[in-house]
Design a protein with these regions (language model features):
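Intrinsic low-complexity/disordered segments
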Residues: 18, 28-30, 185
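Hydrophobic h-region of N-terminal signal peptides that target proteins for export
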Residues: 10-21
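Active-site gating/metal-coordination segments in enzymes
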Residues: 74-193
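An N-terminally biased module of ancient metal coordination in phosphate/nucleic-acid-related enzymes
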Residues: 22-100
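Bacterial N-terminal signal peptides that target proteins for export
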Residues: 1-8
Length: 199
């Protein structure tokens, strides 16, 4: 019995003094917004640099489908969407910003990005026509749709208009269009409230 204990103790000692080898992990990011809620960004070169430093080889990239309003009654510009009670509104130009940034890249860098169209109002039955126009403007650029905001709690409370639902008529039309173009759709839908402590 003493021999077994001595062997185990020796094994533990070997394990603890053996140098740990760092692994060369590489990652894919499945959810990255290129812009903030004011549709501003640090730019594509900063993003590529951060990806390189973090070993991120591929990224799903989208804009943000809403923009934060700076209300005339607020003396200072809010720093974030939750900075005050001013509304956010649907903002379709977010996709133009993403597309323009991707076009700055050379072909090898561009292959690292998987852009999703997000700049549409998911309550509007015109959304599918808008998405089709965007797909036609840049054939082959867009690889998916989303992130589509449905219930996003504090953002939902600030969004002008009706709260989107994943099963509304407008999004059903978007799903059919996505199927036609063989595009995945990414939805954001919280299941509990951030404002209240119960589901």
């Amino acid at each position: 019995m003493l021999n077994i204990r001595n062997c185990l103790a020796a094994l533990c000692l070997v394990v603890t003094v053996t140098p740990v080898q760092a692994r060369d992990y590489h990652y894919s990011d499945s959810h990255l917004h290129f812009v903030d809620f004011f549709q501003e960004t640090d730019g594509m070169q900063q993003l590529v640099k951060a990806m390189d430093e973090s070993n991120i080889d591929h990224v799903m990239i989208s804009g943000i489908p809403v923009a934060k309003k700076w209300h005339e009654n607020e003396p200072k510009r809010p720093r974030y969407y939750a900075g005050d009670d001013a509304a956010v509104y649907w903002y379709s130009a977010t996709d133009v910003l993403v597309a323009a940034a991707l076009k700055e890249l050379d072909e090898d860098q561009r292959k690292r990005f998987h852009p999703f169209l997000s700049g549409f109002n998911p309550n509007d039955k015109n959304a599918d026509a808008h998405i089709r126009r965007m797909l036609d403007l840049d054939p082959g650029l867009w690889q998916g749709l989303g992130e589509v905001f449905t219930r996003h709690d504090d953002i939902t409370a600030l969004t002008q208009g009706d709260t989107p639902r994943a099963n509304n008529e407008a999004l059903t039309r978007v799903y059919h269009l996505a199927a036609e173009f063989d595009l995945p759709v990414m939805l954001h839908s919280n299941i509990t409230s951030k404002r209240e402590r119960n589901p």
